[in-house]
A protein has these predicted regions:
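Flexible, low-complexity charged segments
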Residues: 1-139
Length: 139
């Protein structure tokens, strides 16, 4: 009874290194296609809206790019990207920052502006998506 169990265990252990190396090789091949995220740090903080009372926002934003080369180019243009986003946020109202649908619309507009800016500077949009990691407003 012990012999079949020991034999099965030995067989499993002998095959384990080949399974382990196959699993390790897969991420390397997939790594070339994985997107890279560029966090805009520090978070964007400013005021928005018009009127006698100041309203503030804080936005933690990440930009999705295709690879590390694109990430390097995006990081180089980060001051210009931050400026575009700050100007966009300054134009917002309570309605455009208060509702989920409006925030999605703002996210899409922010992505479009970042892509246009990079298109002008690099000849390609480079950024495939823009994510709000955190968006806090104080109306």
């Amino acid at each position: 009874m012990r012999t079949p169990i020991a034999l099965s265990l030995a067989l499993c252990l002998s095959l384990f290194p080949s399974f382990a190396s196959a699993e390790e090789a897969a991420p390397e091949g997939e790594g070339a296609n994985k997107p890279v995220y560029v966090d805009l740090t520090p978070a964007l903080v400013g005021n928005y809206g018009s009127g006698p009372r100041l309203q503030y926002y804080k936005a933690d934003i990440a930009l999705q790019v295709a690879d590390k080369d694109a990430a390097t180019k995006v990081e180089h243009h980060e001051p210009l990207i931050r400026n575009q986003l700050i100007m966009l946020f300054a134009q917002q109202t309570d309605q455009s920052l208060g509702m989920v649908e409006a925030k999605e619309s703002l996210r899409q507009e922010a992505l479009k502006q970042v892509q246009q800016t990079l298109e002008q500077e690099e000849g390609k949009p480079l950024v495939t998506d823009l994510l709000f990691n955190n968006l806090i407003v104080q109306p």
